[in-house]
Design a protein with these regions (language model features):
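AMP-binding/adenylate-forming catalytic core of the ANL superfamily
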Residues: 104, 121-123, 275, 396, ...
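Conserved AMP-binding/adenylate-forming core of the ANL superfamily
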Residues: 17-18, 23-27, 35-80, 84-88, ...
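Conserved beta-loop-beta connector loops within the AMP-binding
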Residues: 364-393, 429-430, 492-496, 530
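Gly/Ser/Thr-rich phosphate-binding loop
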Residues: 247, 269-277, 286-356, 369-370, ...
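Conserved pre-ATP/AMP-binding loop-to-beta segment of ANL
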Residues: 34, 145-146, 159-161, 168-190, ...
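Conserved AMP-binding/adenylation subdomain of ANL enzymes
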Residues: 209-226, 234-273, 288-289
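Structural core segment of the AMP-binding/adenylate-forming
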Residues: 64-65, 92-168, 490-492, 517
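Conserved AMP-binding A3 loop
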Residues: 47-50, 186-210
């Protein structure tokens, strides 16, 4: 006899099914840890009880201001308490939160505001000039709210009212808008623009919920954890830590700007246990420690991603007392989807080997359903040889809904039933992936593939090099040749030929760059090198 599991009394009901959403995390922490610090910002401290109350008032105020389900509320602000409040208050009003990259120019901000059809814009005074210029480019202006902040640099008021005035119009007793379907949109995140105009990735409540839990599990956080905001909240909603910290009732420490000495001071003053950031952040901390002589009083866990971390930087960070966890992800997958899950037996490896192992992007997270490295045409997985290269692909609950107003790009991203990252990797015998390049960044010279990351790793090994980026430049005979852009720790401390000699002793001859360009390397706010700008620069110079 077959069991009848489709009987009416066995179907979903309120008692046994609710759409997954990270919004519930806030209220649990307010119930369990009402008087513990939820947010620390300078001399200001906000308890979990008051944090929840302010989020409820924000949701109410937005509804009373005309925000309806599915409306976009944008923010142009650094890592401050108002942004944390908006991550709950906006979706509790039924809205979609859109945190805008604060390093963008006015034209790019205007593009995002118009493309996302933002109904409200919250602005930090330090960015009021950019916001004013962006708003002037729009056919219609959203409701503008000034976030007043004593710690901000001077900036004029451009809004219709202040953030506190907005909150005063709301009530914590008003009803909130819960998602009826966990696939409803919770946020709108624009890609970092390494290839031109950004695309708007739509996140859903289910993905945000699962990724938040995956983060606290893999980052080993609990109610006693103190999380420092060195990672921009506008990047993948701070890799979902805007919600994840609430899941365990930990403490947020807000930071307007990444300054190495200030980070060390905050770690000591507030007992920071965790933070995230691109490898450039690790590099800044290593350099800052060298200048100031600062050290950690206790270990601090760091989750790093954004680009392959150079082995020398990883080793130097560990020597300072940081516990580095290398992760990997994309805007389109709610942030982090894989990590170099560490094996305790690797602790005994020689330093250089440990760093090489840690630089791998590793294996899928506990909430990532499937990951593979495969031929982009046939979808055949590459062998685990550590040599055969393929494209990194994912599928499962972490995938975005799609790109806003861009069906063709959405279909291309999900072609073949997988999300195509465009990253090229090998798979080692233990199943750990190792990204070698972006598909568009691989250098093909005389029919041979040259990994720009491999060349960059060697450049980073030189003690005078602070940062490096390698691109392909056109060559009449070989088709393409490597060109290295290099930032030095001390300007003028190294000659190009000296650096090339260093490379020749560590690389195959055909992989050694033909040219070295010294100077600043332009990056996105999340630490990714904008290689398309470097290519344009070389092309403009006739190379």
């Amino acid at each position: 006899v077959t069991l009848n599991l489709d009987a009416p009394f066995l179907q979903r009901r309120d008692a046994n099914f609710r759409p997954l959403t990270p919004l519930n995390f806030l209220f649990r922490s307010a119930d369990v840890f009402p008087d513990r610090d939820a947010i620390v910002y300078g001399d200001r401290r906000v308890t979990w009880r008051d944090y929840a109350r302010r989020c409820l008032k924000l949701a109410s105020a937005l509804r009373r201001a005309g925000i309806e389900k599915g409306d976009v509320v944008a923010l142009l602000a650094p890592n401050i308490p108002a942004v944390l409040e908006a991550h709950f208050g906006v979706p509790l009003a039924g809205g979609i939160i859109n945190t805008i990259n604060i390093r963008l120019d006015a034209a790019a901000v205007a593009f995002i505001l118009e493309h996302g059809e933002a109904k409200v814009l919250l602005v930090d005074p330090q960015w009021s000039a950019i916001a004013r210029e962006a708003l002037a480019l729009l056919p219609s202006k959203p409701l503008v709210i000034d976030i007043e902040d004593d710690m901000a640099e001077d900036g004029e008021r451009i809004g219709d009212l202040t953030y506190e005035e907005l909150l005063a119009t709301g009530s914590e007793d008003d009803d909130v808008v819960w998602p009826q379907d966990e696939f409803e949109t919770i946020s709108l995140n624009y890609t970092s623009g390494t290839t031109g105009n950004p695309k708007g990735a739509l996140y859903h409540h289910r993905g945000a919920y699962l990724n938040a839990l995956g983060q606290v599990l893999h980052h080993k956080m609990d109610a006693d954890s103190v999380y420092l905001w060195t990672l921009p909240m506008f990047h993948c909603n701070g890799w979902c830590f805007t919600w994840a910290v609430a899941a365990v009732g930990a403490t947020h420490v807000c930071l307007r700007k990444m300054v190495a000495e200030q980070v060390f001071d905050l770690i000591e003053a507030t007992g920071v246990t965790h933070f995230c950031g691109a490898p450039t952040v690790l590099g800044m901390l290593v350099d800052g420690a060298e200048r100031s002589g600062k050290r950690l009083g206790a270990p601090v866990a760091v989750m790093t991603a954004g680009s392959a971390p150079p082995a020398p930087v990883l080793k130097a960070a560990e020597d300072l007392g940081f516990i580095v966890r290398h992760v990997y992800g994309t805007t389109e997958m709610h942030g982090v989807v894989s990590l170099c899950d560490w094996h305790r037996e690797w602790d005994g490896l020689p330093g250089a080997e440990r760093s090489r192992m840690m630089a791998r992007q590793g294996v899928r997270t506990v909430v990532t359903d499937e990951m593979m490295v495969a031929d982009p045409v046939t979808l055949a997985p590459v062998p685990r040889t550590g040599e055969a290269m393929g494209e990194v692909m994912f599928r499962g609950n972490m995938g975005m809904k799609g790109y806003l107003k861009n069906p063709s790009a959405t279909e291309a991203a999900f072609a073949g039933g997988w999300y195509r990252t465009g990253d090229l990797a090998v798979v080692h015998s233990n199943g750990y992936i190792d990204i070698k390049d972006r598909s568009k960044d691989i250098i093909i010279s005389g029919g041979e593939n040259i990994s720009s990351i491999e060349v960059e790793e060697v450049l980073y090994q030189h003690p005078a090099v602070a940062s490096a980026a390698v691109i392909a430049m056109k060559h009449d005979h070989w088709g393409e040749r490597p060109c290295a852009f290099v930032e030095l720790k001390v300007e003028g401390s190294l000659a190009a030929e000296e650096l090339l000699d260093f490379c020749r002793s560590r690389l195959a001859k055909f992989k050694v760059p033909d040219r070295v360009v010294f100077g600043p390397i332009e990056r996105t706010a999340t630490g990714k090198v904008q290689k398309f700008k470097l290519r344009d620069l070389i092309q403009d110079q006739g190379h």
